[in-house]
Amino acid sequence: MSDALKPLIGAAADRPLTRAEAEAAFEILFEGEATPSQMGGLLMALRTRGETVAEYAAAAAVMRAKCNAVRAPEGAMDIVGTGGDGKGTLNISTATAFVVAGAGVPVAKHGNRNLSSKSGAADALAQMGIEVMVGPAVVERALSEIGIAFMMAPMHHPAIRHVMPTRAELGTRTMFNILGPLTNPAGVKRQLTGAFSRDLIRPMAETLAALGSDVAWLVHGSDGTDELTITGVSWVAGLSDGAVTEFEVHPEEAGLPVHPFEAILGGTPEENGAAFRALLAGEASAYRDAVLLNAAAALKVAGRVTALPDGVMLAAEAIDSGAALAKVQGLAQITSEAT
C-alpha cells in the first residue's frame, strides 16, 4: 500500500491534478504499489470529476515509459479505435490498416481483443491466419519487411496487469478505456483514431498534442461508431501544427455513397473473416466503401494525399491490385514463423 497515493486521491476528488501529480499517481499504480481500493478510488475520483487533458497525458506518458517499445519505420502511423461503441460493426480499422499499408504507408497498429464488435481487431486477424501474441522482435521484423504489424496491448504494456482486476471489478468505464490509442508502443507521430463518444475527440486530440504527436484525426460517427462512418456525417478533431480544429466529414465529399447502418453490421468471427476476405478480393459493398473512406482519411493524415477523393482512389488501387491482400499474407507468414 502506498501512503503517497492517499493525498493524491483526495486532491483528485476536489480539483484537477497537475500533470506532475497525475504522473506520480500513475507511477504508483503501474508499479503495483497501490491497493485495489486505492486504484478504484483514484479512477472513480477522476471519472466523477471529469478527467482533464493533463491527467490523460500523464497516464499515457507513464504507460509509454513502461512499455515494451518497438522501432518503426519513418512515417509509420496507427489506425485504431477505442472500441466500446457497442455497435457490433464489421472490423473497419483493421481492414483499413492493411489497405493503407498496401498503399505504401507503414502501419504500426495497436489493439486488443474485442470490446463491442463480435470480432475485434485481434479476432479478425486470427481469422486471416495472423498470430497476434507476438513480441517486439517479431513486430519490428514485420514493420521492416512488409510495412505493417499488429501490437497486442498486453504484450507491450505489462504494467497494466496491476490495474486490470480493479477495472474489471469496477464494471464501468474509466480513463483506461481511451488510453490504448494514446499509448502506441512504436511511438508513432501520426494516427487516425476513433472514439466511442463525440465528447472525447477534442480532449484526445489535445492529449496527443501534449504527448508530441504531429498529425492526428480523432473521429466519431453520427451513428455512434468509433470511426468515420459511411452512414452519414462524422465529427473530427484534427491535430496539425500543434493546433486542434473541429470539422465534419461526409461520405459524399470523398465521392462515396451513403449506406444504411445495417449494411456494415458484423456477425460471428467466421462471418466477419469471410467479409474481410471478400473485401480484399475486390468485392463491392458498403464494407468496402467504409474502408475506403477511412483509408482515405488515414492517407491524408499520413501526408500522402491532400484531398479525400484522391485518398479513395489510392486506397481502391491498393485493394484491386492485390497489394492489401499481400500485406495480410506477409504478416500471416512472419507471425506463423515466429510461433
Swiss-Prot record:
The UniProt record gives the binding positions of Mg(2+) 2 as 226-227
Has the keyword Amino-acid biosynthesis been applied to this entry? Answer: yes
Q: How is the cofactor bound?
A: Binds 2 magnesium ions per monomer.
Mind telling me which GO cellular component terms the entry cites? cytosol
User: EC number(s) on record?
Assistant: 2.4.2.18
Cited function? Catalyzes the transfer of the phosphoribosyl group of 5-phosphorylribose-1-pyrophosphate (PRPP) to anthranilate to yield N-(5'-phosphoribosyl)-anthranilate (PRA).
Record's protein name: Anthranilate phosphoribosyltransferase
